[in-house]
Amino acid sequence: ADGSINFTPTNDALLTNPLAEIVPGTQVDNTKKYRIFNSIYTEVKLMEGLKYRVNFGPDFTISRNGRFYGALTNNIKGGNPTATTDNRFGFNYTIENILTYNKQFKDHNLGVTLLQSMQRDNFEQYTQSVLGVPVETQQFYNVGNASSIQGVGSNLIQWTIASYMARINYDYKGKYLLTVTARRDGSSRFGENSKWGNFPGVALGWNVHQENF
């Protein structure tokens, strides 16, 4: 015995040695993923009580998965080595435009917020599977020199969400509060006749602890 693993320890070729798969390079499943994201904003005071702010949030992702099964593995059982690559690219971003106005008139406080936002997502995927990798040390790299292509696939997913919102906050002496909100949201993933929805709202408040009794 030279210490090497006997791939078929019996006369039955279908009964392979599971320990063969611990040999480095015979079976590979490798994933690399990189992601860059951030949140950027700028704010400008247009006049007394009036401000404009823009928020931008980009999110970029790239990943690669490679799989390789050599001849001496339980999946292949002495046949032709196989390899698969899966490459994915994603770019998502959110942008918000916000206008706010706050003003006090003696005992009255008024706040107005206007918002427009959009979220966009773009996802791409490319896959390829081959049979008959000529040199096992190349694993899932250079799959173009394999003896045959088993499958090629691609995928593209894109969607957009858009929103508009207006909100008014009012209070009198901090005692009596009123908030009125109107929002309109739309999504490209909904049907042609149901892409948009309207969401109004009204809230009343009373700060009892501000009363004199």
Please name every model-derived segment.
Residues A1-I22, R67-T82, E124-V152:
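Surface-exposed loop/turn segments flanking beta-strands in extracellular/periplasmic regions
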Residues A20-D59, S63-R67, T84-Q104, F123-Q125, ...:
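Outer-membrane beta-barrel transmembrane strands
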Residues E48, K106-H108, G174, P200, ...:
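Short coil turns and loop connectors of transmembrane beta-barrels in diderm outer membranes
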Residues K51-R53, N109-T113, L177-T179, G201, ...:
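Residue-level detector of the transmembrane beta-barrel scaffold of outer-membrane proteins
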Residues I62-R67, H108, D121-T127, R189-N193, ...:
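Outer-membrane beta-barrel proteins
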Residues E96-T100, G201-E211:
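Short, well-ordered amphipathic alpha-helices
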Residues R184-S188:
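Conserved short loop/turn motifs at secondary-structure junctions
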Residues N193, F199-G201:
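Outer-membrane beta-barrel domain signature, especially the mid-to-C-terminal portions
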